[in-house]
């Protein structure tokens, strides 16, 4: 792998002794505010958001190889994390402009790769919405944007984790049958593209290439993919990149995410870990708002611990070391 010694050392700080990235994702901002707003009438406060992130960091980072936080609400949590837990910091603004076509990327204006590194980050993470079938006038802007961030990370000698979320402006519901049919190609082609050396990406954070709710044996209703077809999409995904890649949990339940990882492994996907967010901690949100800090802490120590512990056991059996990828 043509990475600098410093980048390799940094990725080692983000992974466990087996070279697997078992990372906890809690850089949610807009999505977290919406989750909190379901359980209270007033707007969630900055203090509320920061404190929930601190609670999760205090209770769960001892079981994670690293944690992904945002520099807007997550800095107190970064200080509260376990001393052996690595730190990724998000560089993108939350969400996207729903009134503009193309879901164009945007950095947090007060931050740079240099500043994130100075804040203690072992890696910079950036989220990009990408549709390989979008107009080239949109996609060329996105490619140039990622080239800039990649160059920044090379200059600062800090790993660049690129998170790619696929979409199609013509299919508003990405949980639909229509999107499930086009998802494998969109996910795998985007991975192939951003593996090109010009982007200087070190680790890809990606979706699984199918919607498991439409896979034979997992589906409760309509089936879009047979088990064999779904397995082939995972194989194709593994072949789409030479880079280390990790899966995001995409807000599915802890159980479904774990079953998905087992399926990926059986299909031959040599993925290198996860950045798992809501599947681990989402249940704490309602408890925190309705019953307070102590009750949320208790939830994290019991259910939250079980979620992350079960996930770690599954990763031990399914994920492979990022050092094996060339």
Curated annotation (Swiss-Prot):
GO terms for molecular function: 6-deoxy-6-sulfofructose-1-phosphate aldolase activity; tagatose-6-phosphate kinase activity; tagatose-bisphosphate aldolase activity. Pathway: Carbohydrate metabolism; D-tagatose 6-phosphate degradation; D-glyceraldehyde 3-phosphate and glycerone phosphate from D-tagatose 6-phosphate: step 2/2. InterPro entries: Aldolase_TIM, DeoC/FbaB/LacD_aldolase, LacD_aldolase, Tag_1.6-dipho_adolase. The keyword Hydrolase does not apply. This is Tagatose 1,6-diphosphate aldolase. Keywords: Lactose metabolism, Lyase. Belongs to the aldolase LacD family. It holds the Pfam family DeoC. Its EC number is 4.1.2.40. Coiled coil: none annotated. It catalyses: D-tagatofuranose 1,6-bisphosphate = D-glyceraldehyde 3-phosphate + dihydroxyacetone phosphate. GO terms for biological process: 6-sulfoquinovose(1-) catabolic process; D-tagatose 6-phosphate catabolic process; lactose catabolic process via tagatose-6-phosphate.
